Amino acid sequence: MVDYSVWDHIEVSDDEDETHPNIDTASLFRWRHQARVERMEQFQKEKEELDRGCRECKRKVAECQRKLKELEVAESDGQVELERLRAEAQQLRKEERSWEQKLEDMRKKEKNMPWNVDTLSKDGFSKSMVNTKPEKAEEDSEEAREQKHKTFVEKYEKQIKHFGMLHRWDDSQKYLSDNVHLVCEETANYLVIWCIDLEVEEKCALMEQVAHQTMVMQFILELAKSLKVDPRACFRQFFTKIKTADHQYMEGFKYELEAFKERVRGRAKLRIEKAMKEYEEEERKKRLGPGGLDPVEVYESLPEELQKCFDVKDVQMLQDAISKMDPTDAKYHMQRCIDSGLWVPNSKSGEAKEGEEAGPGDPLLEAVPKAGNEKDVSA
């Protein structure tokens, strides 16, 4: 009979795992691998120190016993030295037993340590030849995944949302047992996107709840990839491990959860900023005048004396200011005002004589009120 209990001692992590695009995969697995390697190195260092200490203690015991035998054979009068060596030998044997007990505890600890991708197996062969099916084109696989996700969400969206609202471990396990088809990549992807949507809508408390369930599904998927089994066949093992209050495993879960929530907040912030930029650009395009210029930008580029004229909406004041300017500059600024819609030719200008050209200070131009955004820049 196969002993499946060893599966309870597997630390799920694999640097080759794939995660949803919204998750910073590189940082996630780099941190896990680094933390695991550091723990293994620290454990190995402690084990080597214990081994050295035990060997040194055994050496001292052997040396002390050798001296005792020499004194006993010599039958000299060194009774005091003999008693001292016997006391020392007794103390050293106590220390030896202490070192051996520590080594035994270390071996038990090593035996109970969770397996991981670095210790799960050893090379049986240095070279293997495996026939593999040719991979499908990346475009086809991506398109197929998108279609699969869309179909799955359309069918099970209500159930996925129900799972995302669960709080207790037992409730989550029972719901997945009753709806085992939800244990898949599509559920995890939907929950990630839902978290970002909730953060954009400023539903922070609800986002944190759904984020917790997202990490539950992510950890189950990682366990399945580590064991190379279907996620539906191993999700109960995740709940068994997490409910046994394994401190190290629980701390790892909490760390990944907090890191995920930070990434969700960052992604939501970027989405909001992008939407604001698109909105501002759309509003700017709405403001554009007949010549394609933004009245706000044109107003801000005008000399101060012309800006004052627009502020007080005084046509005569504007014409006086223009008449005092260099004709080239005046024509340049007035043309920009017309192109932006700050000024439009007077509708009565059609009464002017044919062929008569209106200049910057021509009274045939008058101010037409325009709706502004940040400033009322119309005269």
From Swiss-Prot:
It holds the Pfam family CDC37_M. Residues 124-146, 344-379 are annotated as: Disordered. The gene is Cdc37. This is Hsp90 co-chaperone Cdc37. Its main location: cytoplasm. The modification N-acetylvaline is found at V2. The modification Phosphoserine is found at S13, S121, S378. It comes from Mus musculus (Mouse). GO terms for cellular component: cytosol; HSP90-CDC37 chaperone complex. SMART domains: CDC37_C, CDC37_M, CDC37_N. Keywords: Acetylation, Chaperone, Cytoplasm, Phosphoprotein, Ubl conjugation.
